[in-house]
Each structure stands twice: as C-alpha cells, then as structure tokens.
UniProtKB/Swiss-Prot annotation:
Gene expressing this chain: UBQ8
Compartment(s) of residence: Cytoplasm; Nucleus
Role summary: Ubiquitin exists either covalently attached to another protein, or free (unanchored). When covalently bound, it is conjugated to target proteins via an isopeptide bond either as a monomer (monoubiquitin), a polymer linked via different Lys residues of the ubiquitin (polyubiquitin chains) or a linear polymer linked via the initiator Met of the ubiquitin (linear polyubiquitin chains).
CDD domains for this protein: Ubl_ubiquitin
Location in chain, cross-link Glycyl lysine isopeptide (Gly-Lys) (interchain with K-? in acceptor proteins): G78, G154, G551
Lineage: Eukaryota, Viridiplantae, Streptophyta, Embryophyta, Tracheophyta
Family according to the record: Belongs to the ubiquitin family.
Example of a GO cellular component annotation carried by this entry: nucleus
Protein name, as recorded: Polyubiquitin 8
Amino acid sequence: MTIQIYAKTLTEKTITLDVETSDSIHNVKAKIQNKEGIPLDQQRLIFAGKQLEDGLTLADYNIQKESTLHLVLRLRGGMQIFVQTLTGKTITLEVKSSDTIDNVKAKIQDKEGILPRQQRLIFAGKQLEDGRTLADYNIQKESTLHLVLRLCGGMQIFVSTFSGKNFTSDTLTLKVESSDTIENVKAKIQDREGLRPDHQRLIFHGEELFTEDNRTLADYGIRNRSTLCLALRLRGDMYIFVKNLPYNSFTGENFILEVESSDTIDNVKAKLQDKERIPMDLHRLIFAGKPLEGGRTLAHYNIQKGSTLYLVTRFRCGMQIFVKTLTRKRINLEVESWDTIENVKAMVQDKEGIQPQPNLQRLIFLGKELKDGCTLADYSIQKESTLHLVLGMQIFVKLFGGKIITLEVLSSDTIKSVKAKIQDKVGSPPDQQILLFRGGQLQDGRTLGDYNIRNESTLHLFFHIRHGMQIFVKTFSFSGETPTCKTITLEVESSDTIDNVKVKIQHKVGIPLDRQRLIFGGRVLVGSRTLLDYNIQKGSTIHQLFLQRGGMQIFIKTLTGKTIILEVESSDTIANVKEKIQVKEGIKPDQQMLIFFGQQLEDGVTLGDYDIHKKSTLYLVLRLRQRRYDF
C-alpha cells in the first residue's frame, strides 16, 4: 500500500514522497535523489531523533502515513578523528571517510614524524589494513584509533629450553625485530639449533605463540630482552579422552582417541564419526569450557596427552529466519541454530541462483557483520530473526592484450585498493596502473561506488610507459588564406596530456592553443586526458583541425525551465561559460554543473572539445550548498 511521507531539509524545504512501508531507507534516499538531485552518499535521514540505516525499512522504524523525516546533508569535506598513542597522547587528524589507512599513516607522519612502516593502527580491537578505507571500517566523525609503534631497530630476546634438551646452552640469544613473525623466530631457532619449526612450541607469559595469521612479536607484547620458553612437540601419537555430557542423545561409554597434536578439530570429529558413527555435523567439542573450531589444531588449544574433551550433541530443531536485501526482497530460510553463517550464505545462493555467491555476501544482524565460521546460535539468532544482506560484487579488468581478470570487490573499495588486488593477480605495481571506465580515468582516492561501477562492470587497464615515443600530427599551416596540409613529428610520452601535445604543436608550427582541435580514431581529444587514455602509441597519427575565430550563440536551460542565451566562442572553456552565467544570473561558478548530452562538462575543457556548436543547448544544475549539522 502506497503512503505519502515528507522529508524536511534544514532550510525548511519540504519534499513529498510516495513510498511503501516496506521500502528500505536506501530506496527512500534514491527517491530523494531522483526528485532533488542530492547524491545518496550525501544524505542523512533522521526520524524521532535517530539516524536511519540504509538496510532497514520504514516499517522497521514505525514510519507511517504523513510522517516527517529530517534530511541533513553530509558535506563532501573532511571529518575529525583522534589517534591515541600508548603513552596517552592524542593526535587530531582532518580526514575523509574515503581516505585509505595509508593516507592516515601519512598524515600521522606529517604531524609526528613517525614513518608509516613503523605504525600499526587499531580500531575496535582490529588492526587496520593499508589498502582499506576509513569507511570500510565504519570509522566516523570523532572516532578514536589507537597507534602502536613497530620498533624498526633490532632487539635481543632470550629463548629458554626445558631440561632434557641437549642444546649448546640452556638459553639462546636471538637478534630479532618486533615486526618478526613467530614463524620467523622459529626459523632463526632452526638455523641455530637444527630444530624444525613444526617441532617447536614457544611460550610467553603462559601463552603459546602461534604461527597462524602471521602474528608478530609485537602482537604478543614481546619486547627487548624478553624471555620465551621453548618446548618440544612430540611427533609420536598420543591419547586423549572424549567424554559424553549427560544430556547427549549418544549415551554410549566415553571414548579414547589416538591423535597427534597437529590434528585439526575436524580430524578429531572424523575419528569420532569413524569410531562411533556420530555424524560430524551433530556434535561440538568443548575443552576448558571453550567450543573448539574445526580448522584449529589440538596444539592450538594446548590439548596434550591425557587431556579430556567434552562432546555435546546438537539436536535437530529447525526454525525459520528471514534474510532481507537492499531491494526489499525477503528470503525465507529453514535453518538450525548451529548452522554456520557460511551455511546460511550457501542457502541464500541455492534460493537465489548463481548470484549472490557466498563469497560476495555480507550478512548483518543488529548492525554487526556475521563471520563465516560462527553459528547462528553464537550470535543469538533465533526463530523469525531478520538478517540483512549486503552484496559484494565481481568486476572484470581487461588488459591491453585482451586478457581478462576477475576481482571480488565492494562498492566502497577505493581505486587504490582495486589496484592492489590487481597487483596480487598480475604483479604490476599500483603506480604503473591506469584504470579506465567508460572512457574516464579512475582516481586512487575515489571509490567504485563514486564511479557507479556495479556488478560485472568491466574496467580497462593500461600501464604507464616510462620512456618517450614518436607520434605524427597531420596539421595545417597557413600562408595568407590558403591552408597547406603538413605532417609534423613530435617526441612525447604516453603520460603527456592533450594540452601538453597542443603546446608542442604551438612550438613547432605556431598554431595558438585555443585554435587547435585534435582528433584520433574519430574522437575529439580532451585537454586534461593523456595519450595513454586514448591508447595513442608509438607511430600513431593524430589529426589537427584549425578552429576559426568568431562568436556563436548557445542556450543554457535550468531545471525550472528558464533559458539563458550566451554569446561564446568555441575556444571558450567551460569555466569561461560559467563566468558568463554568473555575470547574467549571479550564480557562482562553484554552484554550477553544466550538462551536455548527459555528460557533466569539466571546467578546463573547451566548447569545441565537446563539439558544442551554434545554438546548442546545455543544461544547468545547481549544487546545493548546505551546512552540516550533527545530532
């Protein structure tokens, strides 16, 4: 059922919207964008003093007929965050949500002189990765990050062995860095004592140090002159006990299992299934009060010879939950409380077809992203709970030779992080990559969403050529009134802009910049683009047309229907045109967006570059200039 609601801006303007209560907040923002031209990412909607989340519906917030929402605009500018050091010092930074963690570290270096490679940034207990953005981690205005320093100089640590091992000394001294991984340290011990890493157990302050996840000495708080204890892993078999809890449906006697410390929990479950015919998916193992994860080893949990595990049977008791997409679609699923999030994603895939694939799905419950290895019960998800589905996407990158690579991304990924993914696949450093989409070059700090790059879009990848090349320009030189066709040779680089090329032409044959129009492959070349953008290579020929001087009339049409008549020249830049509009209408250039044939016009480009002729009509859209208010 359609209802009418209102969105009120801080300037007291009221926007009337026709909606359904099942519409998501994201859909409502899209309706506002269609009506007012305000981009989705600049909108904040407030109801009853609460900011509304994109993935939830109007009904979720009890928004009914003739309710009024308040629309607050997000400024494109930055925000302030805080970085706190371990000494208690707080650093204030001006950032944007699209800034990468690398950018933030560079800002810290500018303020404090700390090299980025010495910095580790922590937020909500999680270490932040360089290629990701602040938005990826939901870091908002006035959030606090924690800065931990990696010591770049070497340090000394001691490794003490238990009695019974005939080392050359009871204590080893190792030269290490705080950024060394546990795996590195074990390799150093192997170099000194010949003891294989998989035979070593390192202990610090009663905690075993594991090689999983590339943990470092700094991660475990190990500093200069700290002492680790080294114990040996016995490679022979050992016996452990598995005890049934009283309420299990499998009430047979307790079990003895022959295992190795390197066995995973899944291996142990498989042994139980072989021995007692207990299906693997119907039981969980507990040790020291903690559920054991399938991919971890017995050694990880410090399970040793004679240890006792407890077996808990998981009864089948199906329930129904709902998964809601951003397009308002609701998917009903029959699940068990011990189904993993990975299982749930597979069910979504089965119901919805090939897409969305599990690896492209993000499931959200109570504002928290759910991890694949955890169960519904771990998140207290019960009968008729609603999860929210946010989709990642696959995009394609086409290389110059025709090869296509596939990337898994989020629309919030920056172009810089996409280049890092490409480097992982093809080995090309990001600073040598140029990515194009719909003919435009993508800027590192912007996101895929900023460029409206969607699932299965194709980007084109070119590489910076580091050396010069020769191209030809077929041009006109003038003697009196008679034009003479002439071909000139230019020394250029693929990174040269079209404006640079025009300057070289002016130096060679004297044709003024504002009277040159360059064409390649039937396309007019835009001044700010590079030769590489147009795939102009060694030996290519560009055609130069001579622009005659002389005025012309064009029309500027506003969204209110008003038409403005301007006297211009084809050599006028878009910035010049905006100034003429300011003189006529008093509208500042930075509040103007000019559109021609659906394309936004760039300030530094000329009317001639866009093939705008006499009596052409441009459309004028005003940029809203709002203050930002925070509740």
